[in-house]
Amino acid sequence: MQGKSIRLGIVVAEFNYDITQLMLQKALSHAKFLNAEVKVVIKVPGTFDMPLAIKKLLEKDFIDAVVTLGAVIKGETKHDEIVASQTARKIVDLSTEFNKPVTLGIIGHGATHEQAVERIEEYATRAVEAAIKLVQRTRKIDELKEVKETVIID
């Protein structure tokens, strides 16, 4: 990573704690490896409870992006589908409302506990990487003045 450091907030669900705490550990170590600063970690009861915490972090000038971490495990009803879809929708809304990246490190819906355990590292590290890349790339967009030819930002 070059230039201005990237400052992250992490919102992590306590529900399915055995999974989400490992996700948090992986995310913290990966952010450090990529030289990003994790400024705040907020724990919320479940993924459905994330939007308010995300919004509060996005309001802070010292947060460039928010990483969400959670696991929505399949149950016997469609509750997991409702939780996952409503949370994802609101996360996208908040990202565009505040013009800051919010990345989705939420395992599920439809995942079994075993599948969630297998996906811990993948989802946690990808969410951190996505947040960092999006901050870097949106900064490049902000620096554009006039474009006469196609610009590829990566």
Curated annotation (Swiss-Prot):
List of residues binding (2S)-2-hydroxy-3-oxobutyl phosphate: E76, T77, R119
Keywords attached to this entry: Riboflavin biosynthesis, Transferase
Entry keyword Plastid: no
Gene Ontology terms for molecular function: 6,7-dimethyl-8-ribityllumazine synthase activity
The keyword NAD belongs to this UniProt entry's keyword annotation: no
Reaction equation(s) it catalyzes: (2S)-2-hydroxy-3-oxobutyl phosphate + 5-amino-6-(D-ribitylamino)uracil = 6,7-dimethyl-8-(1-D-ribityl)lumazine + phosphate + 2 H2O + H(+)
UniProt-listed Enzyme Commission number(s): 2.5.1.78
Active site: H79 (proton donor)
InterPro entries from the UniProt entry: LS, LS/RS, LS/RS_sf
Gene Ontology CC annotations of this record: riboflavin synthase complex
Intrachain disulfide bonds: none
GO biological process, one term: riboflavin biosynthetic process
Organism domain of life: Archaea
Residues binding 5-amino-6-(D-ribitylamino)uracil: F15, T47, F48, D49, A71, V72, I73, L104
Pathway stated in the Swiss-Prot or TrEMBL entry: Cofactor biosynthesis; riboflavin biosynthesis; riboflavin from 2-hydroxy-3-oxobutyl phosphate and 5-amino-6-(D-ribitylamino)uracil: step 1/2
Family: Belongs to the DMRL synthase family.
NCBIfam families (UniProt xref): lumazine-synth
Function as written in the Swiss-Prot or TrEMBL entry: Catalyzes the formation of 6,7-dimethyl-8-ribityllumazine by condensation of 5-amino-6-(D-ribitylamino)uracil with 3,4-dihydroxy-2-butanone 4-phosphate. This is the penultimate step in the biosynthesis of riboflavin.
PANTHER family: 6,7-DIMETHYL-8-RIBITYLLUMAZINE SYNTHASE, 6,7-DIMETHYL-8-RIBITYLLUMAZINE SYNTHASE DMRL SYNTHASE LUMAZINE SYNTHASE
Name by which UniProt lists this protein: 6,7-dimethyl-8-ribityllumazine synthase
